[in-house]
Amino acid sequence: MKLGKWSVLLLVGCTAAIDIPRKPFPPTGSGHKRLTFNETVVKPVIAPSSTAVEWISTAEDGDYVFQDSDGSLKIQSIVTNHTQTLVPADKVPDDAYSYWIHPNLSSVLWATNYTKQYRYSYFASYYIQDLQSFKLAPLASNQAGDIQYANWSPTGDAIAFVRANNVYVWTAKSTTQITTDGSADLFNGVPDWIYEEEILGDRHALWFSPDAEYLAFLRFNETGVPTFRVPYYMDNEEVAPPYPRELELRYPKVSQTNPTVEVRLLSRATGEVSSVSIKAFNATDLVIGEVAWLTETHSQVAVKAFNRVQDQQKVVTVDVLSLKTKTISERDGTDGWLDNALSITYIGQIGDSKAEYYIDISDESGWAHLWLFPVAGGRPMALTKGEWEVTAILSIDKQRQLVYYLSTQHHSTERHVYSVSWKTFTATPLVDDTVAAVWSASFSSQGGYYILSYRGPDVPYQELYAINSTKPLCTITSNAAVYDVLKQYTLPKISYFELRLPSGETLNVMQRLPVSFSPRKKYPILFTPYGGPGAQEVSKAWQSQTFKSYIASDPELEFVTWTVDNRGTGYKGRRFRGQVAKQLGRLEAQDQVWAAQQAAKLPFIDAEHIAIWGWSYGGYLTGKVIETDSGVFSLGVLTAPVSDWRFYDSMYTERYMKTLQENANGYNASAIWDVAGYKNVRGGVLIQHGTGDDNVHFQNAAALVDRLVGEGVSPDKLQVQWFTDSDHGIRYHGGSVFLYRQLAKRLYEEKHRKKSEGHQWSKRSLEF
């Protein structure tokens, strides 16, 4: 578990119940102060906290480990309300970043000397701490903050770890190097950049069998994958070096060579490593999305395989002893794409049947639902159904034959917690699902207790429950202090509604009104889309009081904001999101323009000042919106945008656009290319990008700016801001604060822009 202040928990002193009832809408505050830039962007003053715990398996259900306020590790028992110190504060390593508890509580594995790599991955040194003597022993004797991953086996008798792209297994007696071919281009047990970012969403690619007798891991070969170089001009130095350091990153772009992937199985008893041939698709096109054990021991493992463009899927089981494979499930998704849900969970036999099953999330009915799949193959059974979607599996209770899950059953912007029995197929809400809200839950190891987390729209809180009880045992996190702060401020009013397209489909909208809103005044409006495939921005979760709140609070700005989830976004069914396949940017831009046209008709909107700003895919979408030359938007801000999908990674892009050879016209149409809208947008365009962006490369902004300049876009229509060495998040050397100050300045200028303003250059075309 990662360390941090958010994990502080004292059960002994928690309150009996929530003393401030939550309402089904966001708070607006009861004071008179307006939020300032410093109170929203620099150091937010309204910031609810939450608690995460590590449930552990002990004799008593309901035990969990947490880090106390003094830094010590403690174990708390819900049943006895007893707290025991596992590691005193003075015995915790000074630079500890994360920890993992031994299954029998005899020791702790610590990650120290942390160095970030990519989105999920990092390097660290690891130490094993005995909980009797508190002595620390290095996992590897000569480690130097260079271990990529480590974790206990389920039985606690071993630790699998990865160093220099090789897999090792540690036991109390010895450490064994399992692979020896790890190199800059060969990855064992950890994903390369693209698999980490786009497929696995994690920093490891190895999995112990439930009995810890076997270890399955993936081997990635990047030979032939093109290299992209990212320069670092400052490289964390105060004085720039004469020559920039360059990160050489194997980054496959559209239609380029992808890494190949193979499955390996280690028998711990023999030390033998076997290669498993997954023949679901051609080896050069094979994408492995998931590996999951379908057994309580080590008899078989499942591999979810996709073709290169991820519109064909096969689930293949591997008999561990014979290495024979069998395809037990297939799907065709050529009407769009197939998402990698990463949710396969083995449940075994159901009732009196001898057939074994696993659970997975699939949208084969047109909506993402829970399905029971026979391990031996055959027709699956829908465990949930309806025109709504399951968004996550929270827990599986095999003893009670229940699956706990989150779904959009009440509305796509909401999340409620349910259980469903695979014996009766009956679903039961754990919360009142008629009240608009976003919930989540964390269940104890044996499923007898859970922490129920209310995430909005009102101030979040957390309570502890026993299964089958409607009364909380106590409040874990009340965030009562947030209400004390809210008494001082007046906040923008947030509301939710739907816009109905001419086609009959609806778009979810989240609206913020300025704090002193008057329907008799006219206000500028800022659209803030993301809009990417399967994404969601319009949610009834707690909305952080950050930049959007600031621009609605500052009396010199007072912007209305609309966030609109266009076609292609998530949680409204396969048809709604699949429409954008092979044509990214077209329908999304149409929807944002249409929504802005509807906003312009409102009596309180200043139709002359309608701005749009987006980041990443939202930056791309902003660029496509300006390209439409609709005349409805008067200012565009593109932050870290894609400008041409040929510049982005293959596994994300081809999932939605297919290959360049198959869809050349689609790629041409999806690029930001037409410049008329950029010449005509009344308030101009601001483009922001980090030069050290290893995800959406600075190349995107550079190529777009070259196109706009080369086609004669006037200087008063185009402003460009790069951020030296900043990655996709733009934080390096104060970049974040500068970015938002610049954005606020442009919004201020847009609000006060007069119709006739503009240098003579903007009134005539330029010739070169």
Swiss-Prot record:
Entry keywords, A to Z: Aminopeptidase, Glycoprotein, Hydrolase, Protease, Secreted, Serine protease, Signal
E.C. designation(s): 3.4.14.5
One of the GO BP terms on file: proteolysis
Main location: secreted
Pfam families in alphabetical order: DPPIV_N (PF00930), Peptidase_S9 (PF00326)
Keyword Thylakoid found: no
Catalytic activity: Release of an N-terminal dipeptide, Xaa-Yaa-|-Zaa-, from a polypeptide, preferentially when Yaa is Pro, provided Zaa is neither Pro nor hydroxyproline
One GO CC annotation: extracellular region
Keyword Glycoprotein applies: yes
GO molecular function ontology, one term from the record: aminopeptidase activity
Glycan-linked positions: 38, 81, 104, 113, 221, 282, 468, 668
Catalytic machinery residues: 616 (charge relay system), 693 (charge relay system), 728 (charge relay system)
Cell location: Secreted
Gene3D superfamilies: alpha/beta hydrolase, Dipeptidylpeptidase IV, N-terminal domain
InterPro entries: AB_hydrolase_fold, Peptidase_S9_cat, Peptidase_S9B_N, Serine_Prot_S9B/DPPIV
Leader sequence residues: 1-17
Stored SUPFAM superfamilies: alpha/beta-Hydrolases, DPP6 N-terminal domain-like
Role according to the record: Extracellular dipeptidyl-peptidase which removes N-terminal dipeptides sequentially from polypeptides having unsubstituted N-termini provided that the penultimate residue is proline.
PANTHER family (UniProt xref): DIPEPTIDYL PEPTIDASE 4-RELATED (PTHR11731:SF162), PROTEASE FAMILY S9B,C DIPEPTIDYL-PEPTIDASE IV-RELATED (PTHR11731)
Protein family: Belongs to the peptidase S9B family.
Protein name: Probable dipeptidyl peptidase 4
Species for this entry: Aspergillus clavatus (strain ATCC 1007 / CBS 513.65 / DSM 816 / NCTC 3887 / NRRL 1 / QM 1276 / 107)
Lineage: Eukaryota, Fungi, Dikarya, Ascomycota, Pezizomycotina
